[in-house]
């Protein structure tokens, strides 16, 4: 599976008053962060992360310091592991049971492929508390919080587009399109005004040698309800379904119609091109907000990609990662209490101050672009969707990473691209295509 590099935001956010208070752990004698929760005897546990120097690392360090201040008897030793082989190190440490009590864990199928050494948290933290965290089910067994939550989310992330308001105004576009038909009208106006509508390439994160197609695919597949995405996993809905091909045919028309750059396969400057005003739109995520605001100021806007025949009413809002407890941890009460502490308003404020979007229901941010993104599901009736590359088999993701890009560039037909994805799926054993999600 493609390893997403979680590039955190460089600006500070803030939590508004009135957040829901965290509940006490079901196995403790006090609220999270209180001395009565874990006793007063000296305890040392370790925490591994792969954040480097990102804002996620700042949030983690500040959470640890705040928790230790509440518990002078507790020492949490932070270990920053290399990102490129982080999960290999975790797996090796789990075999010898020499790893950490707490560890950064990615959500979706990343969690499920590692669940053999993760501790379910439902007996330590009340389900009512866990369910206050948006998207907590995506770090749970079978993506069902009732079946056992493994990960307490650290932050929320979005897949979204960015657009240049000044270029839209120059082309005479007064409102952002909401469906395929309106989008095609808009890109035609931009082209007529001599403006490149979209730029595609490696983007802000540089996840692959070409562009990352799953920002787009997530929105194209919103023609199905969230629950029906499981049919893509089981094969009940084939990737070669005519409805999916119809979506891809509309999508690739953006490139074949001349509404993108011509070098979509090898453009390494797409994000910089957008920031410098050379294109009206680009696909990214919330990790790009800070750079976009710095470069374009009030001229930058965020949008929900309107890759739908009907007005789009879904948004990718997903807890990209968080912390889990290993099942071989020798001080589970302390580790669980730290995770419970992460659900409290005080901890969520620390997360926000580091420039991340907290996952607690009712939280918000002072940044206007993030506020707009949060408002779609919170206030406008949009349905929250996961990142599709986190909930379909990694082998299919790997195939799609090349075939979808080739189809967009016009070097492969959409039918062939989807057939290769379907062939990859059907080659997997039945256990990997069952009604129960598994990581491997």
Q: Where does each model-flagged region fall?
A:
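Hinge/lid segment of periplasmic solute-binding proteins
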Residues: 107-159, 184, 212-213, 243, ...
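Glycine-centered hinge/linker elements that transmit conformational signals in sensory
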Residues: 187-189, 232-263
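Conserved C-terminal helix/tail region of periplasmic/extracytoplasmic solute-binding proteins
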Residues: 169, 256, 382-440
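A structural signal for short loop-to-beta-strand junctions that line the ligand-binding cleft
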Residues: 93, 100-101, 128-167, 312-315, ...
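Extracytoplasmic/periplasmic substrate-binding proteins
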Residues: 50, 110, 249-331
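Extracytoplasmic "Venus flytrap"/periplasmic binding protein-like
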Residues: 66-134, 169-178, 281, 291, ...
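Mature extracytoplasmic/periplasmic domains
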Residues: 120, 271-272, 276, 287-291, ...
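Extracytoplasmic/periplasmic solute-binding protein
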Residues: 146-154, 159, 184-236
């Amino acid at each position: 599976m493609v390893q997403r590099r979680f590039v955190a935001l460089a600006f500070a956010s803030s939590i508004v008053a009135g957040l829901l208070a965290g509940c006490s752990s079901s196995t403790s004698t006090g609220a999270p962060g209180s001395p009565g929760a874990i006793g007063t005897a000296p305890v040392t546990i370790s925490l591994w992360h792969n954040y480097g120097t990102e804002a996620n690392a700042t949030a983690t360090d500040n959470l640890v310091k705040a928790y230790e201040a509440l518990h002078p008897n507790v020492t949490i030793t932070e270990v920053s592991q290399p990102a490129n082989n982080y999960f290999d190190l975790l797996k090796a440490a789990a075999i010898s049971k020499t790893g950490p009590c707490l560890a950064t864990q990615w959500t979706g199928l990343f969690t499920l492929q590692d669940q053999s050494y993760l501790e379910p948290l439902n007996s330590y933290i009340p389900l009512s508390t866990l369910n206050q965290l948006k998207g907590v089910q995506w770090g749970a067994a079978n993506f069902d919080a009732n079946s056992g939550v493994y990960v307490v989310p650290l932050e929320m992330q979005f897949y979204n587009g960015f657009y240049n308001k000044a270029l839209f105004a120059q082309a005479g576009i007064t409102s952002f399109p909401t469906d395929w038909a309106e989008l095609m009208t808009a890109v035609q106006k931009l082209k007529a005004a001599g403006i490149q509508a979209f730029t595609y390439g490696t983007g802000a994160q540089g996840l692959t040698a070409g562009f990352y197609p799953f920002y787009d695919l997530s929105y194209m597949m919103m023609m199905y309800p969230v629950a029906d995405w499981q049919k893509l996993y089981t094969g009940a809905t084939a990737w070669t379904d005519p409805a999916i091909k119809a979506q891809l045919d509309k999508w690739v028309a953006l490139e074949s119609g001349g509404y993108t750059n011509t070098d979509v396969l090898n453009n390494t400057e797409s994000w910089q091109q957008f920031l410098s005003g050379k294109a009206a739109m680009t696909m990214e995520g919330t990790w790009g907000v800070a750079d976009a605001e710095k470069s374009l100021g009030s001229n930058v806007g965020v949008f929900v990609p309107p890759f739908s025949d009907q007005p789009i009413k879904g948004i990718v809002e997903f807890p990209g990662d968080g912390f889990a407890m290993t099942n071989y941890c020798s001080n589970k009460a302390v580790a669980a209490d730290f995770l419970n502490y992460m659900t409290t308003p005080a901890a969520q404020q620390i997360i926000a101050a580091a420039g991340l979007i907290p996952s607690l229901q009712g939280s918000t941010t002072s940044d206007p672009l993030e506020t707009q993104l949060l408002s779609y599901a919170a206030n406008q009736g949009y349905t929250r969707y996961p990142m599709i590359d986190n909930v379909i088999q990694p082998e299919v993701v790997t195939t799609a990473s090349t075939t979808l890009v080739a189809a967009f560039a016009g070097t492969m037909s959409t039918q062939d691209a989807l057939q290769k994805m379907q062939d990859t799926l059907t080659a997997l054993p039945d256990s990997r295509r069952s009604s129960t999600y598994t990581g491997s």
